Amino acid sequence: MSYLGENRHFSFRDGCCESLSGTVSNSSDAAEFGRTIAGHFKRFAAGCENFDHTHILYAISSGIAECGKDVFMYENTELPSFKFGYPLLSADCGIYISGNGSIRISLFDESRFPLCDRTLTALMDDSAGEPA
């Protein structure tokens, strides 16, 4: 397991980011994450494992869309189905939201592999992009 570090809201490791305790409970923090990741990819697919996480799904997707990027959403989907489907939409980044208690956001490249440490470090150190 490779621990990369933390920013205000997330701990970054192994192709995912996990919310720090007491953070990312509101939509504005999740939208900020969406604006941040929008600067690194062109087309996104975002999904969540159950309806408990839809507010985070919508907020991240909103942040991405604010920056003029395409985002496809999958509500209430299992990870294998999500990983199979998003490359068919030509998405170059997959965002999967899961977790009980803390939010875990798994990030995948266009080939269904977890994002590399270099990209995660860039996300961790980057600030939110400007809306289009």
Which residue stretches match the model-derived regions?
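An N-terminal, well-structured beta->alpha segment
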Residues: M1-C67
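A short, terminal or domain-edge coil/loop segment
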Residues: V24, G94-S102, M124-A132
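Generic alpha-helical secondary structure signal
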Residues: S28, P80, R118-T121
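Ferredoxin-reductase
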Residues: K42-S111
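Ser/Thr/Gly-rich flexible loops in soluble cytosolic domains mediating phosphotransfer, phosphorylation
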Residues: E110-A132
